[in-house]
Amino acid sequence: MRRLVPLAFCATLATPTLLHAQGAPTPLDRRVDSVFAAFDRTSTPGCAVGVDRNGTPLVRRAYGMADLEARTPWTMGTISESGSTAKQFVAAALVLLALDGTLSLDDDVARWVPEVRGIGKRITIRQTLSHTSGLPDRYTLHDVEGRPAGEVDHPNAEVMAIVAKLRDLNFDPGEDYLYSNTGYVVAVAVLERASGKSLQSFTQERIFGPLGMTDTRWREDHRVVVPGRAPAYSGTAATGFRNDHPFTRVHGSGGLLLTIDDFLKWSGAMQRGEGRWGAVRDSLSAVIRLNEGTAITYGLGVTTDTWRGVRRVSHTGSTGGYRAALYRFPDQQVSVALLCNVGSANPGGLATGVATVVLGDALEPVRAEIAPMLAVPPEALAALAGRYHSARTEEVLVLEVRNGHLVDSLGGAVLVPWGGDRFRVRGGTAEFAVTRSATTAQVRVTAPGARATEYTRVEAPVITDAALAAYAGAYRSPELGAPMTFVVRDGALLIDQGWRGTVRLQPLYRDGFRMPGGEILRFTRDARGRITGFVAWAGRVRHLRFDRLTAGAAPR
């Protein structure tokens, strides 16, 4: 049961905690402390951060409370959870197996995991590690099955059982990039079957042990007592904190328990690249290209990009209330590692703040975005307003004119004129290019390291009770066996979730609806125009098919 920490208790503890087992701060320490000022309290969960340069510790700081109930502060010995920063360890383990000659990263996954054969498409190990496999993400699949993460304890075997039922992918392998935790659970299965050892045994023998990572282990079972582990929390000091422990046995996509020092031992091995670690490092950061040639920034378990003029290899992580980040700057030989035990912590923002302090003059100055001084006539902006639909991702743009600017009302982005029929997202790098014909308009959205997405203008639907009644009824996913029921009430289409209540759908275009969380449902019809089912696009899951079982009742 999650428990609320009373505010009165928190108020009695509102004092800084940096004096806990930490030496006199250096000037660099004080600048790093400013990044974590919000966590420097005995009333809040906290963080630990470490920075190394050329293998030499520069910073070791801890803030806030590791355990609010036991009133235990964070220290450098506190064990926390990695979130998705764990993925690089699974990728490294498979690279080691490839170096051994046991397998190839370009092997068909089905060689080791026959559960994927029902999909009928060749997926390589490399594609599972680079999120280009097309495998739908497990979190959404659990939700659809009515067994959501956080409420149900899932083991890796359950994820593999779902994979065995899949008959389609988000896209053909290699055609696109879409983050998938499922891919890493499949990768763990490949590793364990190819090596004959558990993930824990293999990584202990080949990675943790050799690198002296004595406080590192996989969270194979969340029920196991781990001395020195910080519990995880959600909430804020204003609302109170609740326990937010990962209630799951899934590991490999996340679920690595470790300390800051162990994190940095791993990063140091990647920096030095001695022996086989050089080949591992280079494999993780090698450029991945989609089938049509686009280079993506994600490699195998890490992202490699350029930030303010310096090369950066990084990953962040979040599971439950745990947050983590590991940033490595190869040319400066600097590593930044952080672990936090509260969901409000922004690991990427914190790691970037620390890197800004540590790298200093090595960074290019932050230049203010200077948009071209272009004025677009109001009538020209009004002509672009409307709804645009991507057949590839099923995403929808709703462009509106607000205060003289073109705005994506669903995504919240403000579009700045950039010359011709081009616009750029204010404060971002995505570019919108508009093309028009006599009958329609299209928007092409591009961003660095991503495949372009084309959207075509669609008309807003005409909504009547009779039109909505055509969608009402019961549906089921043939892959997951999950039911879904639609009803019409008060002039709206709703998903009836029984005791969980109802979800109101927003009409977007003919047969297309949006759920409050952004998920898109598109109903399908036969040659006679009758509703036969629908397909769902939900973030990291695309075109999940549901077949119609029964028609619904009349509106009420």
Where are the regions a protein language model picked out?
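Bacterial N-terminal signal peptides
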Residues: 6-17
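Short, conserved catalytic-motif segment at the N-terminal edge
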Residues: 25-82, 102-107, 111, 161-168, ...
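Short, surface-exposed loop or secondary-structure junction motifs
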Residues: 63, 67, 120-330
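Short, well-ordered beta-strand elements
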Residues: 314-315, 325-342, 442-446, 532-536
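Peripheral terminal and inter-domain segments
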Residues: 352-556
